[in-house]
Amino acid sequence: MTATWEKKEGNEGVLTVTVPAEKVNKALDQAFKKVVKQINVPGFRKGKVPRPIFEQRFGVEALYQDAVDILLPEAYGEAIEETEINPVAQPEVNVTQIEKGKDFIFEATVTVEPEVKLGDYKGLEIEKQETDLSDEELQESIDHSLSHLAEMVVKEDGAVENGDTVNIDFSGSVDGEEFDGGQAEGYDLEIGSGSFIPGFEEQIEGMKTGDEKDVVVTFPEEYHAEELAGKEATFKTKVNEIKFKDVPELNDEIANELDSDAENVDEYKENLRKRLSEQKATEAENTEKEEAINKATENASIDIPEAMINTELDRMIQEFGQRIQQQGLDLQTYYQISGQNEEQLRDQMKDDAEQRVKTNLTLTAIADEENIEVSDEDIDKELEKMSEQFNISVEDIKSTLGNTDIVKNDVRIQKVIDLLRDNAKYVEATKED
């Protein structure tokens, strides 16, 4: 077999492949054995028609397509290896010759992985993230935990405040006409949650139990129901009941409830500070890594084939489908609820998909440029880490993966990211006013 690669414009080229006549004849033999099983010819049992009779009756051409199907995958795979190209999509194949006793020749128009022109990736200016945990952050976490232990208590007197939960009846109308979905009785709404139309919750504040009020709001221009988008609506609203959160004070008993390893408040705070400090340090490291990756990617120049973006979009749609499946939904149900279709969702995700592809290509190119290698020891360490993280044996992980190529690539990319951080110039983060 011979193969030649001719680069064309952009990321496309033509792969011309010639398979010797000897292999063609063998493929025709295989094709005949397959096809003859389905043929009925008077005077012969099914599947027992001699080859000469078959060709005389149907022509050898009847075997050509099956022969191509037999020859093409292997020949294309060998041609890719021989020419050392990296296809990123299925090729467009044009068979130029398939004939008994002659070479099989085909041309494949192939989109290949693009060239990456790296920019600066060392000495990148990165904001140094704060890792010290403040007393305010510690207290905020404590307050958040205590809020989960709060009981909802009916507010007998007083008005609605931010954070209260109100039980309301409402009936919405536009231009005096009620609209679908605009009415409810006994609806619980947490004020400040932002779950209603902008401006609605703010107007409920100050009302008391039994109060009635016309709440006037304007639907957002991008509202999912097009017939309501941008229109002013009036909601006749009645407050049935007001509840507030009765948050307990922190004591030794509650400290132990929040952290079974803590016997008193001081131990709880000490354990929490340690845990939050570790978490903040990890978040700071990840933020610095992300900034380094983004800057190195931004500095690179790549003409990304549309096929690579589409492949990444397919992967992202699949991942999204798996996430919403965990919430009891499927993609078709999501499309109905959101008013979107797959094409719109793909358009929405396209920029992220392109960024993902560019990032991956950039980091891989840096790994190649820096001759970064991954040892068996590196892979074993990563597998041990995965084993601890997911509580699965290393053997089971290997069995699930089939091979360690994915792990090897992940470790290689992580080494690139470490290289970016180690060679970065750190500056103090800009203080927010």
UniProtKB/Swiss-Prot annotation:
It comes from the Bacteria. InterPro entries: PPIase_dom_sf, PPIase_FKBP_dom, Trig_fac, Trigger_fac_C, Trigger_fac_C_sf, Trigger_fac_ribosome-bd_bac, Trigger_fac_ribosome-bd_sf, Trigger_fact/SurA_dom_sf. PROSITE patterns: FKBP_PPIASE (PS50059). Its main location: cytoplasm. SUPFAM superfamilies: FKBP-like (SSF54534), Triger factor/SurA peptide-binding domain-like (SSF109998), Trigger factor ribosome-binding domain (SSF102735). Keywords: Cell cycle, Cell division, Chaperone, Cytoplasm, Isomerase, Rotamase. NCBIfam families: tig (TIGR00115). This is Trigger factor. It comes from Staphylococcus epidermidis (strain ATCC 35984 / DSM 28319 / BCRC 17069 / CCUG 31568 / BM 3577 / RP62A).
